[in-house]
UniProtKB/Swiss-Prot annotation:
The gene is rsmA. It is found in: Cytoplasm. GO terms for cellular component: cytosol. It comes from Helicobacter pylori (strain G27). This is Ribosomal RNA small subunit methyltransferase A. The lineage of its organism: Bacteria, Pseudomonadati, Campylobacterota, Epsilonproteobacteria, Campylobacterales. Its EC number is 2.1.1.182. Belongs to the class I-like SAM-binding methyltransferase superfamily. rRNA adenine N(6)-methyltransferase family. RsmA subfamily.
Amino acid sequence: MVVAKKSLGQHFLTDESFLDRIVNALPPLNPLKLIEIGVGLGDLTLKLLDRYPLKTYEIDSNLCEKMRARLKAQKKPFQLELVEKDALFLKEEEPYFLISNLPYYIATRLVLNALKDPKCRGLLVMTQKEVALKFCTKDSQNALSVLVHTIGNATLLFDVPPSAFSPPPKVFSSVFEVIKEPLKEKALASLLQAPFFEEALQKGFETLEDFLKACFSSPRKTLSNNLKKSVSYREKLDKVLDFLALENQPTSVRASEIKDYLKLLEYLLKG
């Protein structure tokens, strides 16, 4: 019997109906490689292997051992590359699509890593519902929604109740999808000079991420007050005010009321 480790935020999805819904929600992958974070009890992994070659990252050596045993018991060939490694250090040389039931405590960081990685072309993940809603909201209510919609489109697909897991978490989970869009990536990459497109895209994402942290540092305060506290951007405050005037927005505007952050950042960097 496998005992979930609280230190790794393990809650294993066991409900067959939700496992099937996740697999069926995958978009067409060819020619993308499919990457999974976390094998868990192997239930989702085996369903994926029935349809696709798969590479999966798992930090828990006990779960890796259990997964290898389950594969042997299946007595049929699977195309699985099982990597016993922390997914925070995931690095692929080929374009891929990411799928995972992410641990709550590290879900946001792993999603941001995938968004930042030019090789990742999209993701289908399950997180705490609150986190999923932050990524999928269509406006500029928070930094996460701005980041994801600057590089692609995020769609909330369905909720998963605590009863679908073992052990059950205290909150609902949600499955959401992100598909990156080349035209949006091109606009983000154009922010900074770099010899290669992927390098420019990654630097553009990191620059926008840093800027949004400053803008949303205190969401209830005005954008100007937040940037005054930022070592990196306080000297650009006059240019921010100029931009607001050009956009017919008041100086009292909050971060959540900015319509186009990429346009604002481009103005600050190049204007």
